[in-house]
Amino acid sequence: MTIEMLYSKIHRATVTDANLNYVGSITVDEELLEASMLRVGQKVEILNINNGERFSTYIILGERGKRDICLNGAAARKVHKGDKIIIVAYATYDEKELQNYKPRVVLVNDNNDIEEILESI
């Protein structure tokens, strides 16, 4: 049996921009991607804490150190600059993999600086 579980999330990221006139996606700072073990092109769920919106998109690479979190294309209609969001990725695990299951949780501050990295929910 396999089960879909949390793989990684960036918790309470601040939206730095919303660019409607761009091919759809979410731009994420390279350092945040590395810390969260997320990958360019990976499907992610976006949970908007401010308005309750939940939608999916894919990741594109943001410039290292700029702390950009930018929703692009149609997704830009679902957020406003300054909104708090959670960027979530799931993965499918089998029973054996679940014995050592440790999701990655990256906690960020209002400037999208990493405050803590957890390996638990």
UniProtKB/Swiss-Prot annotation:
Stored HAMAP family: PanD (MF_00446)
Residues the record lists as binding substrate: 57, 73-75
Highest taxon of source: Bacteria
InterPro entries linked to this entry: Asp_de-COase-like_dom_sf, Asp_decarbox
Record key words, sorted: Autocatalytic cleavage, Cytoplasm, Decarboxylase, Lyase, Pantothenate biosynthesis, Pyruvate, Schiff base, Zymogen
Intracellular or extracellular location(s): Cytoplasm
General function of this protein: Catalyzes the pyruvoyl-dependent decarboxylation of aspartate to produce beta-alanine.
Catalytic reactions on record: L-aspartate + H(+) = beta-alanine + CO2
SUPFAM superfamilies in alphabetical order: ADC-like
Gene3D superfamilies listed in its UniProt record: 2.40.40.20
Single GO term (MF): aspartate 1-decarboxylase activity
Protein name per the record: Aspartate 1-decarboxylase
Residues modified as Pyruvic acid (Ser): 25
Post-translational modification: Is synthesized initially as an inactive proenzyme, which is activated by self-cleavage at a specific serine bond to produce a beta-subunit with a hydroxyl group at its C-terminus and an alpha-subunit with a pyruvoyl group at its N-terminus.
Assembly: Heterooctamer of four alpha and four beta subunits.
